[in-house]
Amino acid sequence: MQTGFSNSRMNSFISSVLVLHFNKQEIKFEPSVWCEAIDIHNTFSAGEIITGDIICFQKILKPPDIPKYPSVASFLQHVCDRKTYEEVRKVHILEEEIVTLKHQADTYLVQKEKAVTAYDQLKHERDNAVQQVNELRDQSTHIILDFSRKDMEQATEHFKNAREVGDTEYGHTYKGMIHNMKVLIKLSSSQKLFQQEVSILRQWRHPNIITFIGVCSEVSALVYEWLPNGNLEDRIICTNNSAPLSWYNRTQIIGEICCALLFLHSNKSTALVHGDLRPCNILIDANYRSKICNFGMSNLFLQLGTFPPNLTARLPYMDPEFNTTGELTTLSDVYSLGVIILRLLTGMPPLTLSEKVAEALGSDSLHLLIDKSAGDWPYIEAKQLALIGLSCTGMTRKKRPDLLNEVWIVIEPLTRKPPAATWPYLQSASGDSSVPAAFICPISMEIMKDPQVASDGFTYEAEAIRCWFDRGISRSPMTNLALPNLNLVPNRVLRSFIHGYLQQQQPNPAYQQQLSET
């Protein structure tokens, strides 16, 4: 190895390298010799060279294909160009990699978009399939039977007067028997009324709406389930010396009516207004569960400037604003509900009832108006009902509360199970031993074996509510409102009461079987 500098001149060379300046006269340049730095990989940069470092070069014969360098400057330029070329080549390689990666990313993005589109399409097809299955299930579960004229005549003994249980503007109603099953048969007062009621009842199913069984087009008759405890009006005034309703049953009935109205009003775009909510249009089943009827047909009777049939009975429950607007809205039903609440609380006739309750609240004498035949009303709950009832009966719609956000949030907690000490009041005030309504699943309408509380606050039989969820339905069976979640919480307290109740019914073999199943 030979050096291009003598030791005595090394420091001056280093200094000249650091300032990128060379004294050409100090180097004996031989054109036929190729000087190559031993540190060919540029391990050290110029800034890292300090005084005292030795820079070594190796003299080797130039290959024939390597051009001669006429000067040191041209040699250094070649080294610089070579380094620049390598950097440019690396940049080019990186740019090619970037282009490749971008192409791959674009490909993946297209594939993702196709996958999302395919997913959306499959989800749409799945939702349609679920909807069709639910519709088919509903059709199979709620089959509307067609009866002949002969069936109707046999069921009512040719519409015998003794079979008649009601006569209203909606038609004559009869107690009948079809295939050993008790039914309620209504002969519509007009063909138009018959067609409208059939159309409505085919669409609306709810635990607190009377169950529609079938029709007889020949005589414009509708067939419903039989509800043995008559209508709410008869129960309030104790017709035929019937037992008065307990305060607990009255509270439950208020909650059930409110729940049914929420269901009818739930679809804002196609909300169905009852329009004739009165105690006579609320029926009571064997378990003191209430069911509304004759809804959505008031437009056939109520026309502005005309006198509707049975005006005296309708007037106390009729929205005052209807007299000026001729229009019924969901707030019209809220007004009617308020009057019914006050009637159940006091047992008094509806006319001017709101004024009497308001006066009693103002003089702190509400306890004097409360119906004593209902048992010992919890005073705080009674006062809450009085206040919400008065609020509902505001003379103008602007003054009435919203059914969901202001009425239901007050009533719903009152419908919960009372303290254990007051549990006997689940029965009627006369000691009627019918099954308490709280024990009945609102879906299956049977005594619950495994009661579960859903996120809507209602208690259902576990199997029934899970089947409801399995159908892809995420709305409340009671209010038709969206459920916050599909979680279920065991109602162990209620299950304990049901178990105790069934034990008391042990002499009855049917209840013994029910008990063994729980």
UniProtKB/Swiss-Prot annotation:
Residues 86-142 form a coiled coil. GO terms for biological process: protein ubiquitination. Disulfide bonds: none annotated. The keyword Oxidoreductase does not apply. Residues 159-409 form the Protein kinase domain. Residues 434-508 form the U-box domain. Pathway: Protein modification; protein ubiquitination. It is an enzyme of class 2 (transferase). Its EC number is 2.3.2.27. InterPro entries: Kinase-like_dom_sf, Prot_kinase_dom, Tyr_kinase_AS, U-box_ubiquitin_ligases, Ubox_domain, USP7_ICP0-binding_dom, Znf_RING/FYVE/PHD. The keyword Coiled coil applies. GO terms for molecular function: ATP binding; protein kinase activity; ubiquitin-protein transferase activity. It catalyses: S-ubiquitinyl-[E2 ubiquitin-conjugating enzyme]-L-cysteine + [acceptor protein]-L-lysine = [E2 ubiquitin-conjugating enzyme]-L-cysteine + N(6)-ubiquitinyl-[acceptor protein]-L-lysine. It comes from the Eukaryota. Keywords: Coiled coil, Transferase, Ubl conjugation pathway. It holds the Pfam family U-box. The protein kinase domain is predicted to be catalytically inactive. Possesses E3 ubiquitin-protein ligase in vitro. May be involved in cell death signaling. This is U-box domain-containing protein 57. It comes from Oryza sativa subsp. japonica. The gene is PUB57.
